[in-house]
A protein has these predicted regions:
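Surface-exposed peri-terminal alpha-helical interaction modules
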Residues: 1-145
């Protein structure tokens, strides 16, 4: 379950990185280049990754038996709102007949997308800590010596 969450976060982060590059290229339409064809693919992967992400995180927290479950659940409610808001913006862009670099630049600048990315960075870091706790103990012990 933690690997799935990590993969979903990575899909959204990769989409954002691709969109940064796409926005800088000055395309008038997604039909102008190979990158243009890819932008819709990245956006569709992000939609798939975001759909149900908060529920998946809540289920993982329950399965992992994490302490302070109420803190996690409160944050997952925030994640759900940010994901839904970002999904609405992404789906609006996907509904357009042409996706220009300017349109993607505006999507990148969306406060909803930025809030979501910050949420995902936080989730990714927490998932990473729970996925590799033994490695951290070993590293911590070797640093103390």
């Amino acid at each position: 379950m933690l690997a799935e969450i990590s993969n979903r976060c990575n899909a959204v982060e990769e989409c954002y990185e691709f969109m940064l590059a796409y926005a800088a290229q000055g395309f008038r339409s997604d039909r102008d280049s190979k990158s243009g064809g890819e932008v819709r693919d990245f956006l569709h992967r992000a939609v798939t990754a975001l759909t149900g992400l908060a529920e998946t995180c809540a289920l993982a927290a329950k399965q992992e038996g994490l302490e302070s479950a109420e803190k996690y659940l409160a944050f997952f409610a925030v994640l759900d709102r940010d994901a839904r808001d970002s999904l609405a913006a992404i789906e609006l862009v996907l509904a357009q007949p042409a996706i220009s670099s300017q349109l993607i630049d505006n999507l990148n600048a969306s406060i909803h997308v930025r809030a979501l990315l910050t949420d995902l960075f936080l989730v990714s870091e927490i998932v990473s800590k729970h996925s590799h706790p033994a490695a951290e103990v070993v590293a911590s012990n070797s640093n103390e010596e």
